[in-house]
Amino acid sequence: MAEKIIRTIGVLTSGEDAPGMNAAIRAVVRTALGKGLKVRGIRRGYSGLLNEEIIDLSARDVSDTIQRGGTILQTARREEMRTVEGQQKAAAICKKYGIDGLVVIGGDGSFKGAQKLSDYGVNTIGLPGTIDLDIACTEYTIGFDTAVNTAMEAIDKVRDTSTSHERCSIIEVMGRDAGYLALWCGIANGAERILLPEEHDYNEEKIVADIKENRKRGKKHYIIINAEGIGDSMNMAKRIEEETGMETRATILGHMQRGGSPTAKDRVYASIMGAMAVDLLLEGKTNRVVGYKHGEYIDFDINEALAMQKGIPQYQYDIAQQLAL
């Protein structure tokens, strides 16, 4: 591999925000500065890159950020990055600002942008930042742990009042295409039913029958965790109440799941991944994605990472069903 001289590193956050992104940014900045490099922050993701919203970052610029949710660099989408012209323009801007290596924090869509920039000569490293846990090359993504805990605490509160009023509660969590958040919340909150986007053919009649059976067994509530990809929570609540006679309410947690101070796990894992991204660039690696598997931090070719498929672990789903007696 030809030696790649890295003097200046850029960092951006792209797509939806996730708690822990600031910890990753902080780690990139301070690791790079500690190794004698310059760091440039790109505001508002690829949109900011194309608009040349590029600033120098110092160690003080990332002080008091590790505990903050969201992203201090802000984030946005830009359709222009899907075009060859947009990709070439972005690569040219990186060269104009002397950005020898670029760390991209985001999900699959963000990685596709990094992949294209790599094709045009920009050394890129991707860090998995998404609350959906839907990146196949890694068992962990920045923000997932915080989002699960945020949702879990909210669902606990709904469960309290659901039990008091002997209600059925449908709680909708995020996850348009992936049901990991719903699955983990379902297990953590002891839900009676989990509806996943991977299982579109769920049987509402079976849910109604199960609610009736649970009431006969003396259960005072019935909790359904519904992933965003299934949706229709409000109408579902009306139908279930009509069929069972049990008061049913729907709660949509929405964007609160993306906010909040990151957990210790998200802070630590994001910090290690951010530092590793800088080290990989200094080793001459490019077009890579950092991941976490089997207790180790590893890196994958970005093309291989994007080609991987990730499904819901059946054993975990089965356990959730077994425990919902």
What are these regions (language model features)?
Residues 2-50:
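N-terminal phosphate-binding or glycine-rich loops at protein starts, especially the Walker A/P-loop
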Residues 8-15, 71-76, 101-104, 169-172, ...:
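Short glycine-rich or small-residue beta-strand-to-loop segments that form or flank ligand, phosphate
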Residues 14-17, 37, 42-47, 77-78, ...:
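Short, ordered loop/turn segments at secondary-structure junctions
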Residues 104-106, 116, 123, 144-247, ...:
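Accessory alpha-helical/coil subdomains and C-terminal extensions
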